[in-house]
């Protein structure tokens, strides 16, 4: 299979974290797959990267293949294991209102050699915690759009929407502005482009609590709500227990949407694939084929990698 940029793609990398009560879970983990449905852990299931700055934890792991070569990994700067008692009084409202206004980041040319960790100062002083950064490369303007969920002081940190900022180098960033907002609270935005259409997946926290899909011919919208997608999501058992969307094209050309399910015992939590017959067709259905993970992957990103990259990762992290 070839991507739109012509890269021969024969495998997949899934970056993610683990939901554990110990701090080693909230770090950066790698897994790989040849078919996009059955993943195997790398590095013996131990972290690839460990945060030593900010909150000393990484959640909501994002990875981007840079158009100039190499990759950047960006994460939410948050450790529930380290900080929930000390900083947040076991209160998620405190997390939302007083959490980090930076993102953790590492740069790498080859997914093996990494730069020193950085804290990216993207946020504003009036932001609460900045959740789930994701990056979209705007080819027309040759810049990266970073989007994430945050509350703000002006509404007493009660209404999360999707903000965005643009950068060309992940060193300087434009002033954050709203990217997508609704009357209800939303989070976990995932943005992809197929053909000439932009597809935005996100999670409604309420009214109703479930994953949504919207689409537009323009990167900055307006986005049209996909009622058929909402109708199908509403038929799932515990529709509000899915979050953290990430999507990619399978080797046979079908479109895979991964959703992180947390509506069960912790040992069984993790991603579930939903499959559409063709890219751009949002008629997703829960996967009936075999899929497997060595443990429950939590909020992460799947990217396409070459067979050479796959072999190199397997050899280095064996």
Regions found by a protein language model. Give the residues of each.
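Carbohydrate-active catalytic/glycan-binding domains of CAZyme proteins
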Residues: 1-318
């Amino acid at each position: 299979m070839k991507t739109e940029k012509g890269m021969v793609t024969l495998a997949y990398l899934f970056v993610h974290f683990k939901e554990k009560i110990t701090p080693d879970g909230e770090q950066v983990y790698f897994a790989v797959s040849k078919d996009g449905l059955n993943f195997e852990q790398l590095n013996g299931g131990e972290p690839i990267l460990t945060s030593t700055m900010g909150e000393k934890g990484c959640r909501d792991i994002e990875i981007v293949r840079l158009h100039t070569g190499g990759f950047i990994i960006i994460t939410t700067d948050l450790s529930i294991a380290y900080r929930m008692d000390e900083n947040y009084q076991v209160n998620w409202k405190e997390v939302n209102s007083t959490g980090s206004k930076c993102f953790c980041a590492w740069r790498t040319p080859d997914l093996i050699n990494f730069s020193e960790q950085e804290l990216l100062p993207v946020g504003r002083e009036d932001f609460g915690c900045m959740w789930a950064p994701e990056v979209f490369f705007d080819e027309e303007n040759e810049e990266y759009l970073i989007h994430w969920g945050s509350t703000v002081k002006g509404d007493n940190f009660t209404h999360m929407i999707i903000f965005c900022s643009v950068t060309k180098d992940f060193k300087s960033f434009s002033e954050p502005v709203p990217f997508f907002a609704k009357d209800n609270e939303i989070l976990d935005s995932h943005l992809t482009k197929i053909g000439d259409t932009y597809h935005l997946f996100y999670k409604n926290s309420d009214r109703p609590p479930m994953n949504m899909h919207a689409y537009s011919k323009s990167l900055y919208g307006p986005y049209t709500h996909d009622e058929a997608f909402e109708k199908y999501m509403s038929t799932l058992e515990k529709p509000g227990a899915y979050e953290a969307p990430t999507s990619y094209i399978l080797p046979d050309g079908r479109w895979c949407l991964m959703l992180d399910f947390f509506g069960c015992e912790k040992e069984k939590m993790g991603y579930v694939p939903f499959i559409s017959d063709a890219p751009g067709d949002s008629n997703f259905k829960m996967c009936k084929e075999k899929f497997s993970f060595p443990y429950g992957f939590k909020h992460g990103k799947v990217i396409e990698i070459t067979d050479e990259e796959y072999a190199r990762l397997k050899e280095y992290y064996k």
